[in-house]
A protein has these predicted regions:
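Membrane-embedded transmembrane alpha-helical bundles that form the catalytic cores
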Residues: 1-471
């Protein structure tokens, strides 16, 4: 089920909120758990046993780790069970066939692919990381093991962040899970509705609209339509325009989903961590990763980079730790070599900055922003082949070897205003304007109502457009 659909906006969400608000205080987590399972099973009912197994493995392992507090060996055994359970499911569904295909291609073997796992369980990359963080935190004694399986299940499958994050650690919401009375206030609900509306507008008014530019240029994989230009017919400037449009679409799509999820979390009485902080205004790649998908980079920093030694064991070890983290970041995004290349690409950039470039970037004013945006856009080009079936080699040939073809002028005339608005919305300017408008209750309500009505009208009048990060 997608947030930006009629069935979610007009059926699931209102019914769920009504049941949740009307439920007795001690039954709210039960309502949340059951409604979240309905949300998950709506289009993925065959993966319901996978979700249940993941919940049970980590719930029971957490209890066992805490129970055997004085027996380190047993604690490690149950932590290992939890890690193997979560990572094993992720590997089986997401990476097993990729490993087999890669082995066949590289080694000349003839391993048969596993049948029946062509479809990836929605959100598995996100909720497995949540269960991993829970079990590790219990082992570290950072949190107490959750004794109520309904409360634990509600944490794992909470629908606002289930499919595409933000990645929420158990300690982020454990206190709120156990507040049965006065969990939410009217101001929280209002703030949540505001965030949800802005997120919906980002998705349908910006991401989908600017994504149409990219589709008009490159087309859609396996689509019978011939109305698009096609990569082979596009000029180099047009391909650059398309990649810029894709970069904007990816940001508004993912940050819009995160904002909707955070907003719904507030409506339910939970404070989820922020996931984006205007990443396209960054003046270095290092800063970009502090602003982009912050819950993922934070997860890898806390559970991989720091345990490996972080910055504490010399420069060589630091660079090696960075290599491992960026490689895993690429692998996390998808079972495809283009994602591995993308992760290694960022490792090289981050290592160069760490070794010598960062002090020079801090002295600059304009060129560091241009440098960062250029490299980030090139990085997003590595994602494209996975989404559209476009030839990776042809795309980069078009980007970096000037070639003729269809001019971008037609597309600039049709999408120019949208491009300008999109670029402005990548900066804090809109937030500053909103902070001024919200001081007056009339302008605040009118702005939210207008955005909600217009966004909903677009949802009603358009076809279903899934969020891009559902693929990861």
């Amino acid at each position: 089920m997608v947030f930006s659909t009629i069935i979610f906006l007009f059926r699931f969400l209102p019914i769920t909120l009504a049941l949740y608000y009307l439920a007795p205080a001690k039954l709210k987590n039960t309502v949340l758990f059951l409604c979240s399972l309905v949300f998950y099973c709506w289009g993925e009912v065959r993966f319901f046993p996978v979700m249940v197994a993941l919940i049970l493995i980590n719930y029971l392992s957490g209890l066992a780790i805490e129970h055997f507090d004085a027996k380190p060996a047993l604690r490690k055994v149950f932590l290992l069970i939890a890690l193997i359970g979560s990572l094993g499911m992720l590997f089986y569904f997401k990476y097993a066939n990729f490993v087999l295909r890669s082995a066949n291609a590289l080694l000349g073997t003839a391993f048969a692919e596993i049948q029946g796992i062509g479809t990836l369980p929605l959100g598995i990359s996100f909720y497995t990381f949540q269960t991993l963080s829970y079990s590790i935190d219990v082992y570290r004694r950072d949190v107490k093991a959750e004794r109520n399986i309904i409360d634990f299940g509600a944490y794992v499958v909470m629908f606002p962040q289930l499919i595409a994050g933000p990645i929420v650690k158990y300690r982020d919401v454990s206190n709120q899970l156990h507040v049965y009375k006065h969990r939410y206030t009217l101001s929280q609900i209002e703030e949540g509705m505001t965030l949800f509306t802005f997120g919906l507008a980002k998705k349908v008014l910006l991401a989908d609209a600017i994504g149409a530019l990219w589709t008009d240029i490159i087309g859609v994989a396996d689509s019978p339509s011939t109305t698009f230009v096609g990569l082979a017919n596009a000029s180099t400037p047009l391909v650059w325009l398309g990649i810029i449009a894709y970069s904007l679409q990816l940001y508004f799509d993912f940050s819009g989903y995160s904002m909707m999820g955070i907003g719904m979390g507030k409506m339910l009485g939970f404070d989820f961590p922020a996931n984006f902080n205007y990443p396209y205004i960054s003046a270095s790649i290092t800063e970009f990763w502090r602003r982009w998908h912050m819950t993922l980079s934070g997860w890898f920093r806390e559970y991989v980079y720091i345990p490996l030694g972080g910055n504490r064991k010399g420069l060589k070890r630091q660079i090696m730790n960075l290599f491992i983290v960026e490689l895993l970041t690429g692998i996390w995004h998808g079972a495809n070599w283009n994602f591995i290349c993308w992760g290694l690409y960022y490792f090289v950039l981050l290592a160069i900055e760490k070794l010598f470039l960062l002090p020079h970037l801090k002295k600059g004013k304009v060129w560091p922003h241009i440098y960062t945006l250029f490299l980030v856009v090139v990085g997003w080009a590595m994602f494209v082949g996975n989404d559209t079936g476009v030839s990776f080699g042809l795309l980069f040939q078009k980007l970096f070897i000037p070639s003729g073809g269809v001019s971008p002028l037609y597309f600039l005339r049709n999408y120019g205003v949208l491009l300008i608005v999109s670029v402005i919305c990548c900066t804090p300017l809109i937030e500053k304007i909103w902070n001024t408008l919200r001081r007056n209750v009339i302008t605040r309500c009118a702005t939210i109502l207008l955005l909600l009505v217009v966004s909903t009208a677009y949802v009603v009048g358009s076809t279903n457009s899934p969020f891009l990060y559902f693929n990861f």
